[in-house]
Amino acid sequence: MSANQSQSISGALSQLTSSNSFYGGNVDILSSLLQFNLMWASVFLLAIHLLVNTLVYYIPFVGRLPMVGTINNLIWFVATLLLIILVYVASDNIIVKAFGGILVLLLLLSVIILLYKSTMFFITLYYHQSFMVAARGPTVLSVNGSHYSLDFIPSAVIITTRQGKCFYNGHDLGSCSADSCSVILFSGRYRSEFEVHRNSPKKLTVDVCGYTTLLTVYTPKASKTDV
């Protein structure tokens, strides 16, 4: 092999090495940009999640808007997923990997909650054919057409009057008579409807989820009945 040939081979190898280092540098830059974008996207979504929770806590009206809870859970799910991807892409540290495992558990919990809420939404929508009920379900109380989401079946429904208006649990029902209100209780696929007036029994038997439940309905002037 001549000296010229060996010089040309070494030159080609040096060019190949510099080319590989150039592309390797580009890959490192793209990887860093990806990690940076993942981090800020997850931080942004978590900030929205915390903001929604704060608004629901201090402004209860926000929590009664349709699909707020489901959308907030979806935001938490996506933010957690992005954090998991970021942790497993960015680090080989075992401690960081363990932190990623905790995030995986949180993600699975979010998936379970999201699947449960979505399933109950479609079940309620199928049985009651009402988007308003399904969005606030699965347990919903309707008083004169106004729907209220409940965490559990109430033992009493208290309807008060003030300055010619009716109120249920602080919610304005408008101008109506507290002696005659239409109350509907939705729970899953069950629906119980009854009228509230002076001569109606104050203790009502309601069929909810296949079980007989006693529900007390009264106005301020009526004597309270223990359940």
Curated annotation (Swiss-Prot):
Intravirion side: 64-66, 117-227
A GO term, aspect molecular function: structural constituent of virion
Domain of life: Viruses
Keywords carried by this UniProt record: Glycoprotein, Host Golgi apparatus, Host membrane, Membrane, Transmembrane, Transmembrane helix, Viral envelope protein, Viral matrix protein, Virion
Intracellular or extracellular location(s): Virion membrane; Host Golgi apparatus membrane
Main location class: virion
Job of this protein: Component of the viral envelope that plays a central role in virus morphogenesis and assembly via its interactions with other viral proteins.
Recorded family membership: Belongs to the torovirinae M protein family.
Subunit note: Interacts with many viral proteins in infected cells. Interacts with envelope E protein in the budding compartment of the host cell, which is located between endoplasmic reticulum and the Golgi complex. Forms a complex with HE and S proteins. Interacts with nucleocapsid N protein. This interaction probably participates in the viral mRNA packaging into the virus.
Name assigned to this protein: Membrane protein
